[in-house]
């Protein structure tokens, strides 16, 4: 039996009319998936299968319910009988191999955790930074993509953790702009959900400030979604909140913390930002900061995207034909030029980390607070708050991965399982056998390779 499937990104449901038949277990499961409530969805689809074991639609959606919860063994167990019976069912030929790959990564992560030290003692630092990946708290485009509480509670579960640092950094994925001008990125006849352009209201600037963000990157593929006017309005909004920023070509953030002059520059693989793909130009910009600042931080938005982009390849990355950078070349070049810390974001998944010449390189911190328009299933719902300790000379003296995950439509909460630490540990062992950072069971990071 095969039903038409509701898209997982559906955001509204039609309530049954008075006197209508009560929703079936399948309907209840789909409603739960729409709300990204994996636990309820699993219960509903299990009930559906218990009533009709041959119901392929229930089995298929049960796999997606497990997917939302990162229960990869259960995804594979749910789908393998379906694939054997109906190899062409929906997109199972594509998605079952992806689930198997995620299961292999999860199994490796669990094995690596078991063999890791319990903890690493922190070193003596003059600057303690906490950093997160992509943030977009809700968008005015399309209409109705704001949270019911107008994003007021976005950071409630993580605010105290973000505030507990000398510097707190994040990637601002899209402009803060009240200008109603249309986006050149989206065609007027584009189907709903087919074009991803973000524009958050300027009032959200106060939410970032209240959560403790001192500096953000505006160098990313959504910064220009609504043109130069919105980029400028974003910069003015951040300035008014006292939040430092770097994004457009030549822009850097510089300020003083604990008596140390800090310089930060954000790069992206688009020439409308400090340009990641121009290695010589990037080196020159970093050297300018090194000449006048005590500690220099580089952030970059680069790499392919999605659950298949967890590994850092050797060489250039392409995403839908776009050059998303040779990240190993770029990161090593900026450290050689004097950068003390390199923070990556953009793939929407966590990646491994490297210690290169005593400097930490985190290749992707994943999604952190991305409301409504983002796929948060599986690995894309796992994030981190990366703590980094830096000495007066910029050397890495220790750190910690504080795991997060997103609930519902995209609200960050602390993850007691710290799946992020386990993922980073396994991905690091796979991708950086020589220079990989060492991560203990509690998420602390050693200052030595």
Write out the residue ranges for each language-model feature:
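Register position in tetratricopeptide repeats
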Residues: 34-35, 68, 98-106
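Acidic, metal/ion-coordinating pockets
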Residues: 104-449
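Alpha-helical tetratricopeptide repeat
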Residues: 22-33, 60
């Amino acid at each position: 039996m095969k039903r038409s499937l509701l898209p997982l990104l559906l955001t509204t449901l039609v309530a049954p009319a008075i006197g209508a038949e009560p929703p079936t277990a399948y309907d209840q499961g789909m409603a739960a998936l729409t709300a990204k409530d994996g636990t309820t969805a699993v219960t509903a689809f299990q009930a559906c299968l218990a009533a009709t074991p041959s119901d392929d639609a229930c089995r298929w959606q049960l796999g997606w319910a497990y997917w939302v919860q990162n229960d990869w063994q259960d995804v594979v167990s749910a789908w393998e009988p379906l694939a054997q019976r109906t190899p062409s069912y929906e997109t199972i030929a594509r998605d079952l191999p992806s689930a198997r790959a995620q299961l292999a990564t999860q199994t490796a992560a669990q094995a690596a955790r078991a063999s890791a030290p319990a903890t690493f003692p922190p070193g003596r630092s003059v600057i303690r930074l906490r950093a997160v990946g992509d943030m977009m708290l809700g968008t005015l485009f399309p209409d109705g993509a704001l949270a019911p509480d107008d994003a007021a509670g976005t950071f409630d579960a993580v605010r105290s953790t973000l505030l507990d640092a000398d510097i707190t950094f994040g990637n601002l994925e899209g402009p803060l702009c009240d200008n109603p001008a249309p986006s050149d990125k989206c065609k007027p006849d584009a189907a709903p959900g087919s074009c991803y352009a973000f524009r958050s209201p300027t009032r959200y600037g106060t939410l970032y400030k209240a959560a403790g963000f001192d500096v953000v990157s505006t160098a990313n593929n959504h910064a220009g979604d609504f043109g130069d006017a919105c980029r400028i309005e974003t910069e003015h909004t951040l300035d008014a909140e006292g939040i430092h920023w770097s994004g457009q070509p030549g822009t850097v953030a510089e300020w003083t913390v604990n008596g140390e002059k800090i310089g930060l520059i954000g790069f992206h693989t688009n020439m409308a930002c400090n340009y990641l793909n121009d290695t010589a130009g990037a080196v020159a910009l970093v050297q300018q900061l090194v000449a006048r600042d005590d500690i220099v931080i580089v952030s970059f938005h680069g790499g392919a995207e999605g659950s298949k982009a967890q590994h850092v390849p050797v060489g250039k990355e392409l995403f839908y034909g776009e050059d998303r950078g040779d990240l190993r070349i770029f990161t090593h070049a900026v450290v050689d030029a004097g950068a003390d810390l390199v923070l990556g974001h953009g793939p929407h998944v966590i990646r491994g980390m490297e210690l290169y010449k005593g400097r930490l390189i985190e290749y992707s911190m994943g999604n952190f607070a991305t409301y409504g328009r983002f796929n948060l299933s599986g690995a894309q719902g796992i994030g981190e708050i990366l703590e980094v300790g830096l000495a007066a000379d910029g050397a890495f003296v220790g750190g910690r991965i504080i795991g997060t995950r997103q609930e519902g439509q995209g609200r960050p909460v602390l993850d007691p399982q710290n799946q992020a630490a386990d993922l980073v540990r396994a991905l690091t062992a796979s991708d950086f056998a020589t220079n990989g950072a060492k991560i203990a069971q509690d998420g602390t990071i050693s200052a030595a390779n």
